[in-house]
Amino acid sequence: MTSTPIIPADLLPADGRFGCGPSKVRPEQLQSLVEVGSSVFGTSHRQKPVKDVVASVRSGLADLFSLPEGYEVVLGNGGTTAFWDAAAFGLIREKSLHLTNGEFSSKFASVAKNNPFIGDPIVVSADPGSAPEPVSDPSVDLIGWAHNETSTGVAIPVSRPAGSENALIAIDATSGAGGLPVNVADADVYYFAPQKCFAADGGLWIALMSPKALERVAEIKDSGRWTPDFLSLPIAVDNSSKDQTYNTPAVATLLLLANQIDWLNGKGGLDWATSRTADSSSRLYQWAEASEYATPFVTDPAHRSQVVGTIDFDDKIDAAQVAKILRANGVVDTEPYRKLGRNQLRVGMFPAIDPEDVSQLTKSIDWVVSQLG
């Protein structure tokens, strides 16, 4: 093939962004930066204009997730990567248990293992593309797993394992929050970042924390454990109660996040969002199951994610070449997770992505593959 094929316009999605984070940002979100930005950009994050944005985020999330009584919306800078360290310092009393089945679910386990103030964690692993069964152990005081493993497209429902009464349930919902069904009462810490379902930039973490989790934060603080201020959950809880962050936040991220939360709530809340991602994912998986050359990577339909779809290709088809041609035609970020090393495409299907665009994507892929033959 000497030149890049041009996909017919009637096969292309209206918006070609299918990344798994950062993800598609709606035009209305960008417009909101222009409309309200002049009143908050370049102003103190300790004063009312920016604090009102933070308050909008916190109250909007409380509505979106039907936050149980006593739960708090806590936020801080640094994204989920920083929160893993904050949790190791401020939520694990002595020892944790982690379910791992991919790159991101393994990271919290690694952080816990390397923290000098707590014991080595118990790690229950499953191969990429599959899901470990949530379990408990009487020796642990925190159990954690990923609601959605972004690298592989595996979703594990949120629940309290039998025998876990004395442990916090900490769910990494970085790519699942806002796009997968959840009853937040089934977790003590449901934490995430804005660049997936919430269609904003990264660099912020948000945690929905139960009274039990807040008590643990206070308990560990009172124990005198040393913690860097940037990773201090007591400081984050205190600042969040005042609609602030410990250090200066990226205001654009907060504005994009606030607008997306308002949009989701205005459309019908979490029920609407999850029905939309279910629609998108059913289109992708049904196409792959009917295809002669593609198949869902996650073999168990019960664990196929509604927000991140991974599709394996027959060895005769070079998925990397397909992604390259798609990108040249404005359909971007369908490449697989780099460390997984599979001949596949990975498709983000967050609420901002129109299900019709997912259908158009499958048509574009079929056309590209026909040209490669």
UniProtKB/Swiss-Prot annotation:
GO terms for biological process: glycine biosynthetic process, by transamination of glyoxylate; L-serine biosynthetic process; pyridoxine biosynthetic process. It comes from the Bacteria. Its EC number is 2.6.1.52. L-glutamate binds at residue 46. Keywords: Amino-acid biosynthesis, Aminotransferase, Cytoplasm, Pyridoxal phosphate, Pyridoxine biosynthesis, Serine biosynthesis, Transferase. Pyridoxal 5'-phosphate binds at residues 104, 150, 172, 195, 247-248. InterPro entries: Aminotrans_V_dom, Pser_aminoTfrase, Pser_aminoTfrase_mycobac, PyrdxlP-dep_Trfase, PyrdxlP-dep_Trfase_major, PyrdxlP-dep_Trfase_small. It is found in: Cytoplasm. The keyword Repressor does not apply. The modification N6-(pyridoxal phosphate)lysine is found at residue 196. Belongs to the class-V pyridoxal-phosphate-dependent aminotransferase family. SerC subfamily. Homodimer. NCBIfam families: serC_3 (TIGR01366). Catalyzes the reversible conversion of 3-phosphohydroxypyruvate to phosphoserine and of 3-hydroxy-2-oxo-4-phosphonooxybutanoate to phosphohydroxythreonine. This is Phosphoserine aminotransferase. It comes from Rhodococcus opacus (strain B4). The lineage of its organism: Bacteria, Bacillati, Actinomycetota, Actinomycetes, Mycobacteriales. The gene is serC.
